[in-house]
Amino acid sequence: MEFEQVLTEARLVRRYRRFLADVEDASGQQWTVHCPNTGSMLGCTEPGARVWLSHSTRPGRKYAQTWELVELPGEVVVGVHTGRANALVGEALDAGLLPELSGYASRRREVRVPDAPMRADWLLEGHPGGEPPCFVEVKNVTAAVEHGRALFPDAVTERGRRHLEVLTEWVRGGGRAALVFCVQRSDAQEVRPAEAIDPRYADALRAAAAEGVEIRAVRLHPSATGIRPDCALPVHYQEEP
């Protein structure tokens, strides 16, 4: 994924009210931008961190710029825009990084799971080998701890847990479903549930995997020019201390 424009570089002052962040340029001038991430953004909101912003020309928009990237210590760049995760997983599918989900002739976005209060991010259809259609839910991952362990979620997510339960019920009924963690940081080596943050989600993830929901993860490499698919990552179901 290439960014449509040259991103503006700034420094983070603070992130607040979930959807807002204040930034400043080298001269000290400050302004407010849109923060497209509803999580806690654990580890990604240190004041003074280098950030990159995209610009919208849409008329009437209150905040013209959107926070896209943040640089962490060690020159690790993290993509914080959760709205890009679905398209990035689509690119990862095209790049062959999720071979277990390959072979489908088409895919559709935002498709309702039958008899369930949920729209899946993707529906894969038309597998020549006879595989059933596959509902795919995408979760954006930005948090990580030492040794490259990426964690999800970074805040309690009742919605995310309900999505897992819907996918689990779909598989129990004979369907196919997958959850893909979209890890937008190049230092990640694996993905684990953040048990200390949301133990109910961790339990639901393990239950879903045991019932046959396919749990996958893909690493993306963010930079100031774009975000490219990198590699598949292993998923482990226990958070190590």
Swiss-Prot record:
Q: Which InterPro entries match?
A: SfsA, SfsA_C, SfsA_N
Gene3D superfamilies according to UniProt: 2.40.50.580, 3.40.1350.60
* Pfam families the record matches: SfsA, SfsA_N
* Transmembrane portions of the chain: none
Q: Name one GO molecular function term.
A: DNA binding
Q: Which family does it belong to?
A: Belongs to the SfsA family.
Looking up HAMAP family in the UniProt record yields: SfsA
The protein depicted here goes by the name: Sugar fermentation stimulation protein homolog
List the top taxonomic levels of the source. Bacteria, Pseudomonadati, Pseudomonadota, Gammaproteobacteria, Chromatiales
